[in-house]
């Protein structure tokens, strides 16, 4: 039977707030409150997904394995994540911590699971962000060579990127939102131009809807398409991390989440359908086999003009930068929250007095990125095949695991309290989402060789990093419970009251 959520025994009201207040002194004030609206937060999470990069760099691979029916894979992934968002957004109205996944999982599954989730989140977000420096390097190399015939070594580009992202993250969150807004409009705008050209011309064989027929959807490659499609939504769940900086977060966070999921699902499916129409259903597989990475550039040149293809090269680079900035901001806020919880070093909880950004956490994350980029460069690694794919693989799997755990946590949390959210939001949608997220994760793991091109042993290590991180977090929680019981007792507390958590 559900029970009222009540203050925990021995935890005074405002305990978490007092701890954060201690960290937010005159020397290190708090994050800027009520600065972000729905559009700002949506820009952050959509930018993290890097729509143009996903379309130009990954969608051709999805078409290659799934054929003409590939657009449906993106619709199905979007629908599954929208189902996840139902319970996720319901929980954001009850859990006011800005700790994101680890706070939600703590509320529903207990502190040991919450510590494990926090460790996985740090692994996953850092893996995604740092790995993409390899993509930034190769994307910039391609643009420089295509436009001006200049070759620059990839480590120089990646290291420059680390400093650029650090500077953008160091500035205020409003500044970052404006930068991401401009970059997102640029990358989506070029795809809209391509779509307009194809629609006005009628495509290579006339516009057709055969991508959505059962014969083209129910094919052996559909599972692989879904694996690519789920990976394309990475980062949408980070809306909750910006809770402390959002205006009216009870409304802003859910709206931004639904907008991000809805936009990405529809936009991805539409753009994949458009590029299929550009070559025609009978010729698209030949085009993908001949030049998969040039698919969108060739279509843009034919239907819009060479100038637009040149712009696409540039906007892919800015798309990658936008994605990295979004992940950098998310990591910094995870670090800030965990430092203010007393789990990470206190210095990471400092906020810049003027920009109100978690600048120390940003410096730490940038140093970590610099170390990994330099290490891969000194080892003679390939920036795409190794830096990108090896770092992104545990990152993507980790985020999917956190989504599955969060869906279960939603169900467990609402079983314990009285609420008026309804069975759809608290029972049916969360449990269905948990099954779908677990299934999606299994699809990705089962197709991991296709996605990385690495041998079995390498793939096994990359996949096992995720459960290893979770176990490490659980072990840390047990140590903290023994050595620092006050920190353990208030882990993932609400910012204003010590609400009861599971376990």
What is the predicted function of each stretch?
Residues 394-402, 424-503:
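A generic transmembrane alpha-helix motif of multi-pass inner-membrane proteins
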Residues 27-32, 70-71, 147-153, 181-313:
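Helix-loop-helix junctions that connect adjacent transmembrane segments
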Residues 103-107, 134-154, 185, 243-249, ...:
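Helix-loop-helix connectors at the membrane interface of multi-pass transporters/channels
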Residues 1-59, 63-69, 82, 206-213, ...:
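Membrane-interface "cap" regions at the ends of multi-pass membrane proteins
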Residues 103-104, 110, 142-146, 262-327, ...:
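TM-loop-TM module centered on a large, flexible mid-protein loop between adjacent transmembrane helices
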Residues 154-201, 256-265, 398-401, 416-435, ...:
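Membrane-interface loop-to-helix entry segments
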Residues 97, 120-135, 238-245, 306-346, ...:
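Membrane-helix boundary/coupling elements in multi-pass transport proteins
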Residues 23-142, 239, 446-453, 461-464:
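Transmembrane helix-boundary motif of multi-pass solute transporters/channels
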């Amino acid at each position: 039977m559900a029970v009222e959520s009540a203050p925990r025994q021995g935890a005074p009201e405002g305990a978490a707030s007092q701890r954060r207040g201690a960290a937010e002194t005159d020397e290190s004030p708090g994050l800027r409150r009520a600065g972000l609206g729905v559009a700002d937060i949506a820009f952050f999470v959509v930018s993290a997904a890097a729509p143009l990069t996903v379309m130009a760099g990954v969608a051709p691979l999805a078409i290659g394995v799934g054929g003409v029916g590939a657009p449906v894979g993106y619709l199905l992934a979007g629908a599954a994540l929208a189902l996840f968002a139902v319970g996720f957004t319901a929980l954001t109205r009850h859990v006011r911590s800005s700790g994101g996944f680890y706070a939600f999982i703590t509320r529903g599954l207990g502190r040991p699971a919450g510590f494990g989730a926090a460790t996985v989140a740090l692994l996953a977000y850092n893996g995604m962000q740092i790995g993409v420096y390899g993509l930034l390097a190769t994307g910039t190399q391609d643009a420089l060579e295509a436009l001006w015939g200049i070759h620059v070594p990839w480590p120089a580009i990646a290291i420059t990127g680390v400093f650029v992202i650090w500077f953008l993250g160091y500035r205020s969150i409003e500044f970052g939102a404006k930068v991401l807004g401009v970059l997102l409009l640029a990358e989506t705008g070029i795809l809209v131009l391509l779509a307009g050209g194809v629609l006005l011309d009628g495509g290579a064989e006339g516009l057709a809807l055969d991508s959505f027929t059962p014969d083209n959807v129910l094919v052996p490659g559909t599972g692989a398409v879904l694996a690519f499609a789920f990976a394309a939504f990475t980062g949408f769940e980070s809306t909750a991390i910006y809770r402390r900086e959002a205006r009216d977060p009870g409304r802003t966070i859910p709206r931004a989440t639904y907008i991000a999921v809805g936009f990405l699902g529809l936009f991805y499916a539409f753009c994949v359908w458009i590029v299929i129409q550009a070559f025609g259903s009978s010729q698209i597989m030949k085009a993908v086999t001949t030049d998969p990475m040039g698919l969108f550039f060739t279509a843009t040149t034919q239907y819009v003009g060479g100038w637009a293809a040149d712009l696409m090269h540039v906007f892919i680079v800015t798309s990658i930068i936008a994605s990295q900035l979004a992940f950098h901001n998310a990591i910094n806020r995870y670090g800030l929250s965990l430092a203010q919880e007393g789990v990470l070093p206190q210095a990471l909880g400092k906020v810049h007095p003027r920009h109100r950004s978690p600048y120390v956490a940003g410096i730490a994350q940038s140093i970590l990125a610099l170390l990994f980029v330099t290490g891969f460069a000194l080892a003679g690694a390939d920036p795409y095949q190794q830096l990108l794919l090896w770092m992104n693989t545990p990152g993507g799997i980790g985020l999917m695991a956190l989504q599955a755990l969060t869906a279960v946590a939603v169900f467990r949390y609402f079983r314990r309290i009285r609420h008026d959210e309804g069975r759809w939001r608290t029972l049916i949608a969360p449990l269905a989402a948990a099954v779908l997220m677990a299934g999606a994760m299994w699809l990705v793991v089962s197709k991991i060789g296709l996605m990385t091109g690495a041998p079995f042993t390498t793939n096994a290590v990359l996949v096992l990093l995720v459960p290893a991180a979770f176990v490490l977090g659980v072990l840390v929680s047990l140590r903290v419970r023994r050595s620092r019981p006050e920190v353990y007792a208030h882990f993932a507390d609400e910012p204003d009251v010590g609400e009861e958590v599971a376990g």
